Amino acid sequence: LSVTRKQCLELGMVLSLSPMGTYLEGTMGCLQLKHGHGGFVIHNTTQLRIHFIQGKDAILIRMPKIFLRLQSATSLDNQNVRNEFAWLEQTFKRRAYGQQSQSSSIILPEGKGSFWIHWITTQDGFCGLPLVSVNDGHVVGIHGLTSNDSEKNFFVPFTDGFEKEYLDNADNLSWDKHWFWEPSKIAWGPLNLVEEQPKEEFKISKLVSDLFGNTVAVQSRKERWVLDAMEGNLVACGQADSALVTKHVVKGKCPYFAQYLSLHDGAXQFFEPLMGAYQPSRLNKDAFKKDFFKYNKPVVLNEVDFNAFEKAVEGVITMMVDFEFAECLFVTDPDEIYGSLNMKAAVGAQYKGKKQDYFSGMDSFDKERLLYLSCERLFNGEKGIWNGSLKAELRPIEKVQANKTRTFTAAPLDTLLGAKVCVDDFNNQFYSFNLKCPWTVGMTKFYGGWDKLMRSLPDGWTYCHADGSQFDSSLTPLLLNAVLSIRCCFMEDWWVGREMLENLYAEIVYTPILAPDGTIFKKFRGNNSGQPSTVVDNTLMVVIAMYYSCCKQGWSEEDIERRLVFFANGDDIILAVKDEDVWLYDTLSASFAELGLNYNFDERTKKREELWFMSHQAMLVDGIYIPKLEPERIVSILEWDRSKELMHRTEAICAAMIEAWGYTELLQEIRKFYLWLLSKDEFKELAASGKAPYIAETALRKLYTDVNTQPSELQRYLEVLDFNHIDGCCESVSLQSGKETVENLDAGKESKKDASDKGNKPQNSQVGQGSKEPTKTGTVSKDVNVGSKGKEVPRLQKITKKMNLPTVGGKIILSLDHLLEYKPSQVDLFNTRATKTQFESWYSAVKVEYDLNDEQMGVIMNGFMVWCIDNGTSPDVNGVWVMMDGEEQVEYPLKPIVENAKPTLRQIMHHFSDAAEAYIEMRNSESPYMPRYGLLRNLRDRELARYAFDFYEVTSKTPNRAREAIAQMKAAALAGVNSRLFGLDGNISTNSENTGRHTARDVNQNMHTLLGMGPPQ
C-alpha cells in the first residue's frame, strides 16, 4: 500500500482497500508501513483492530498508540464533482523516496455501485494510490479497479460526512480483530462458480452455468419455484440440473406389526395409545421452502459486546488448554481420510450416485490424486456446490402436520476431502474430551455413561435444560469465525493447512447451495448440516455463548468453573447452578439472542430425572441413571418399516428392545411381538441361520449399567436350554412322483399297506424291472436281477419318428430331444410384444433424455404406466404426460418416450401388462376403480376392470369371458376408423392445354353443332 502525507489520518488510522484486506486475511506474519516519518512493523496482523466501511470496498485499521499521528485528509463534497483531480504516487527507494504526480481527470459517480469513475492512465500496482483535488490538495478517494473493456478506471470515494462519521466517532465504531476472512475474500459470484468447477479427475456429471446466461432453452417446463419465492438475505448465483427427491426411506406401516395387533387384542390395547405420535416427514416443495428460507434472515449488527465476546473466546481456549487439549495435525494420509467416509452417502450436487459406486473403479493413486486436488481447491478458495435436500426421517406428528421438514446441506466430494484434512484430527481429540470439558460429543450413553453425566451435575443445585430453535440457520459469521480462531489456535504450524482451514470456514458461511429447482443460492449466515464438523462446531458455539453470557455478568473464568456446571451437545445444553445464582438463567436468553441464538431457559427443576437432553430423559434403575427415549418414539420403530430385507426388520425390533429397557411392560410386549414374528415361516429360516438375534435381560443390564452378570442369573438360562437340539432345520420330506415306489425304495421296510395286504398277496412274487406297481412281498430284495421279467404297462412317446415330420433328403430336420425340452414362455415369442433388446434400448434412451438415474427412473416408470392405463398407448399421443406429486401435477414431455419406442409404444408397454393388472386390482381392493379405457367403452362389470387397458397382453391364462370383453372393447375403439395410405399430393400441377378448334358457327365454346337442329330463332 502506498501511503502519502495527505492520505494518513489524524486519529492514528490507516484507510485500506480490499487488496490490503486480502493481505491481512491470509497472513499471521508482519505488516510493514512506510511513510515520511519512518517505517513501522506490526508482527501479528490478527491483533489489528479493523472496521469495515459499510457499502465501500475499503477498511479502516486502527493503529496502536505508538504509531505517529499524521495530518488528516478531507472528504469529497458535492460541489467538487466537476473539478479536476490528480493522484500522487510515493515511491520508497532503498535510501530515499520521492513523490510523483500523474495526469489529471474529471471524476463521475459510477451509478448504483460504491465506485466512482476517473480516466487517469493506470498500470498494475497502482491500487491504493490516492486521488487528490488539484484545487486544494485534499484526498478524495483511493484507486481500486480498472476496466477490461474501456478506458474507465474506478476509485473508492470518501463519502460526505466521512470525517464526522468515522474519524470523529472512532471510539464508537466496531473495531474487529481476529477476522480470518472478510467480505472481499468471500464476495464470490456466478463467474467464480462457473470458472472454479472441479477438474476432469473428479468426473462431475452436472455443469454450473450462469443463471440468466442461456438465450435458448428447451420448451419443456422448468419451474424455478424456489427462486420465484426467494426473498431476504439469499442471492441466486447460478444454475445446474437438480430435482426434488420425494422417495422416502420409510416405506410405510409395518405389515407384520399391524397383523400382530389385529390378532392380539391385549397388545392392540397396549400399543395403540402410543402409536401415531411420529410420522414420516413430508417431502414436498412447500416444506423445502419453509426450512431453507430460514437462511434469509439478515445479520443483526451492533448488539454484541465485543469485549465480552473476545474474553469468552479466550476463556474457552484457556479452559481447553487447562484440560491439556493438545496440538492437532492436518491429516494427509489418504487411507485415514477415505476410511472415515460414509460410502453410502451421495457424492455431491454435481455428481451422480453414491460414494461406494464412485470409488469402485479407482486405485490408490487415483484416490490420492483426488485428495490432493481437493486440498488444492480449498487452498485456492475455490467453492464446491453443496446440495440442498429434504431429510427423510420420522418426525413428531405436530411437525409433520405443520409441514416442517428439516433440510440437509451436503458437502460435495471436491470440498469434503480437503475439509476432512483440516478438521478430522481436531474433531477426534474433541470427542475424547467428553465430560472432561463442558460437552458430551463422543460420549456413549451405555455402560454407565449417562449416570456419569447426571452425577456430574452437583446434588442440590437447580438444573435447567434448553435447545436452540432454528439453530443452524441462526448462527452468525461472528460465531463461526470464533470457532475458526479456536481451531487455528490448536492446529499445527503449517501455512498451507492454515490457508485451507480459513477458506473452508469462509465456504461454510458463504455457501453455494443447489436447490431442487436447479438454482444455486449463496447464503450469508448459518452452518451447514452436511459439513464434516457440524456437531463439533455447533457445540463449540454453544460453549462460547455460555462463556459470553457469564462474562457479560462480570464472571471470571474461576467463577464459571466454581459456580456453573453445563454440558453441550450440538444445540442441546443442560446446566446446573447454585440456588443463589438461579438469576443467571433469567439473563441467558437475552445474551444468547445478542449472538443470534434463540434459546429458552425456563425449563428448570431440582430433579435430574426431569431433565431432557438429546431427546433422552434420565431414569433411576437400581441406583444408576439410564437414558430413556419417549415410549412413543420407541413404538414408532415398530410401527413404521424402513427395512429392505427381513434381517433389517429383526434388527430394528432388537433396537426397540434395547431402547425399551427400563420400561418393563413395554419391553415385555415387544418381546411377545418378536416371539410371534419368529414363528412365521419366512422368519424361521432366518432364525435357523443365526440372523435373528436374541437379546437377554442380562445382556441389556450389562449394556446399560456396566455391571457384570452373576452366575446365578446365567443358571436360569442353562435350565431351559435344550442341549440335545440338533442344529439346523430338519424336516421329513418325500418325493411326489409315485408314493408306493418311493416307500419301497427302503429295502426291508414294511409299509402299512403291505401289512394289511400280507395275507391276500402271493409271498414270493418277483418285482419286474421298471414296474410302477410292484407286487408286495414280505421282504423286498435289495437287488433286482437284470434278466428278470414281469408285467409292465407300456408308455407312449409324445413325439415319435412315425409322425409326419419335416425331412430333407429323407432325414428329419428337427431335433426331437431338444423339442421335448423346449418350452419357452409364450409371451416372449409374441410379435405383439417388443423384444427384450428393443425394450432395453427404449428404457436406456428415455433415461438418457430425461437425465435420470435408475432409482429415479423407477418412479418415472410407475407414473407413466399408470398414465397409460387411463390414456392408452396410441402412437398419435403427443405433448406431455403428467404424474402426481401429492396434490401437484408434474409434467414430462412425451417426445422421448414415443420417438424411442420401437416397434410401437403399445408393444413396449406390453412388458408392463402384468404389473398394470396387479395395480388395478390393488386399487379396486381399496375403492372402486375403473380405468378410463373401460369407462369410455362403457364396461359395467368391475370384475373385468383389471383387463380394461389397451396394452393388456392376452395369454393362455386369460379367461374366456375376459377375452371376449377385450375383443369387444377393441372393436368398439376401432369402429369407424379408417386410414389412407396416401394423402392429397399438393405438389402436382393441375394445369392443362386446351387444343380444341372453334369457328364462328360453333354453338358455344364446348359444342360445334346441334346435329341438324336449327338454331334458336
UniProtKB/Swiss-Prot annotation:
Record family assignment: Belongs to the potyviridae genome polyprotein family.
SUPFAM superfamilies recorded: DNA/RNA polymerases, Trypsin-like serine proteases
Span of domain RdRp catalytic: 461-585
Catalytic activity: Hydrolyzes glutaminyl bonds, and activity is further restricted by preferences for the amino acids in P6 - P1' that vary with the species of potyvirus, e.g. Glu-Xaa-Xaa-Tyr-Xaa-Gln-|-(Ser or Gly) for the enzyme from tobacco etch virus. The natural substrate is the viral polyprotein, but other proteins and oligopeptides containing the appropriate consensus sequence are also cleaved; RNA(n) + a ribonucleoside 5'-triphosphate = RNA(n+1) + diphosphate
Residues of the active site: D57, C127
Domain of life: Viruses
Record's compositionally biased regions (Basic and acidic residues): 746-760
Note: Readthrough of a terminator codon TGA occurs between codons for Ala-267 and Gln-269.
Originating species: Watermelon mosaic virus II (isolate USA)
Stated name of the protein: Genome polyprotein
One BP term from GO: viral RNA genome replication
Modification after translation, per record: Genome polyprotein of potyviruses undergoes post-translational proteolytic processing by the main proteinase NIa-pro resulting in the production of at least ten individual proteins. The P1 proteinase and the HC-pro cleave only their respective C-termini autocatalytically. 6K1 is essential for proper proteolytic separation of P3 from CI.
Pfam families in the cross-refs: Peptidase_C4 (PF00863), Poty_coat (PF00767), RdRP_1 (PF00680)
Marked site: Cleavage: Q219, S220, Q736, S737
Record's description of how this protein is used: The gene for the coat protein is introduced by genetic manipulation and expressed in squash so as to obtain virus resistant plants.
EC number(s) stated in the UniProt entry for this protein: 3.4.22.44, 2.7.7.48
Single GO term (MF): nucleotide binding
GO CC term, one of those recorded: viral capsid
Record Gene3D superfamilies: 3.30.70.270, Trypsin-like serine proteases
CDD domains xref list: ps-ssRNAv_Potyviridae_RdRp (cd23175)
Sorted UniProt keywords: Capsid protein, Genetically modified food, Hydrolase, Nucleotide-binding, Nucleotidyltransferase, Protease, RNA-directed RNA polymerase, Thiol protease, Transferase, Viral RNA replication, Virion
Ranges where the record places region Disordered: 746-787
Domain Peptidase C4: 1-195
